[in-house]
Amino acid sequence: MNWKRLALCAMLGITVLSTTACSTKTGEQPQGNTVKAETVAMPNFTNAPIADEYAIFDTNYGQFKVRLLGSKAPITVKNFDYLVKKGFYNGVTFHRVIEGFMIQGGDPDGTGAGGPGYTIPDEFSNDLHFNKMGVLAMANRGPNTGGSQFFITLGPTDWLDNKHTIFGTVVQ
């Protein structure tokens, strides 16, 4: 692992720690949308693969760049892109951090219970694993319940394989 990636992850941890409480539980699962008063239909995202692209995350402590894996998780990447273009994530914080495990964001309510009002299906790939720091994945509350919340791993978390859709990786 190069020092830039380590520094980025440390910066992310500090960013999150400055606005959230820490938990030290191990073996946890990132939590997804649990309650939404209004339910809306999922936009019509096809599962046709798309080209990988990049997203820049702006935080109070700087930027980081993520490669979005449209070739492996096209519905999830299209959903993320759709929400970004709608401004859904503007002003949203990383609301949950577990040291050595992950940071979680994407909840407009900041409580861990918010989401877009619809869910998307899981997309698993035999080529993608939670074997390193910097994996970007969709948080959920069970099979096929992803929405807007996502998390970035702070280390290997292999127990999450085939439980959360991996749709990107931190590259800078």
Annotate the PLM regions:
Residues 2-172:
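Cyclophilin-like peptidyl-prolyl cis-trans isomerases
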